[in-house]
Amino acid sequence: MDFLFLTFIPSGQPITSAVMFSAGVVGNIMALVLLEVRRRRTSPSLYHVLVTALLMTDLLGSVSVSPVVLSAYAQGKTLVGMSANAEVCSYFGFNMTFLSLSTLAILCVMALERYLSIGHPYFYERHLSKRCGYITIALIYLACVIFCIAPFLGFGEYVQYCPGTWCFLDMSHAEVKGQVYIGFYASFILIVTSTTVVCNIAVLLLLVMMYRRRVSAHSASRSMTEEVEHLLPLATITVVFICCTLPLVLRVYVNLTGSHEERHAADLRALRLLSFHSILNPWVFIILRPSLLKILWRKLHKPQESTLMRGKTLNSAQNSTGCHLQSNTTI
């Protein structure tokens, strides 16, 4: 069946879309509230600016895309059939492309921010500030908008995918311009994701080096704890994003290098995975928030501390007994 111009949804239930919409909205709102509470307790930083932008972008994705799918199911029409000239399909495809690019770009900037804060602290303190974060986010949004309007100018195309409730860039474009455009999209995702992974690995290695050569146990431990609190959610979200975007990148390269035979099922799975990251991101921040990490850290270390205390008590008792016996022998 050709889903490109289908106007009525053949079958399906909106339960999955409704659950995804609810989880995305609730998760992002909860994460933003927790982030705001923490911001009021501590001085805001560049990292908080970037995290807020990431969560706001994910929330924007949930409220701008999911209601369109629910409306399509309610009307029994596909995205192409909901408007005369497929404007709804173009709107959906624009949002999917914009949100995937902007989210990944923000994640990459967050990874670079962590690397500079640990690897080059003097440069970080001297040249980077919250203002740099606001400017960077604005530039990311601007660049993504410019890229996403290219299909309206003849470079690439937003098309409908199975079962008629998804629209995205044409991953099997026959024209050279369309192939170059979608190839650039996939290559950009691959390069930025690789940069993010390299930065996170570099931060991890730097933290290990800091731990090994620390001079003051108290100050080094506190500094490392703060960095781990930032690194752990970022690394987890990076893994989630790789799992969600890599199948789409592979689908694009397969379509570019292989035949142009339509594989709707594989394309649909890749698109669904792409939409999951905006739902999972806020829950990662909620589960791995610093307060919960500190509680888990204390729970894990409490048995060790108890064992050490018992060992010290036993040694003290043995020493006192030995001293007492020695004094009696002397007398």
Language model: regions and residue ranges:
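Fourth transmembrane helix
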Residues: 71, 102-109, 116, 122-165, ...
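Intracellular effector-coupling site of seven-transmembrane GPCRs
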Residues: 48-57, 205-248
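Seventh transmembrane helix
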Residues: 243-253, 266-312
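Extracellular TM2-ECL1-early TM3 structural module of rhodopsin-like
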Residues: 9-18, 46-109, 117
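Intrinsically disordered regulatory tails of 7TM GPCRs
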Residues: 1, 37, 212-231, 291-331
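Loop architecture of class A 7-transmembrane GPCRs
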Residues: 2-3, 76-93, 97, 146-191
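Extracellular N-terminal segment of 7TM GPCRs
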Residues: 1-30, 34-37, 331
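Helix-to-loop junction signature of class
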Residues: 17-21, 34, 60-79, 100-106, ...
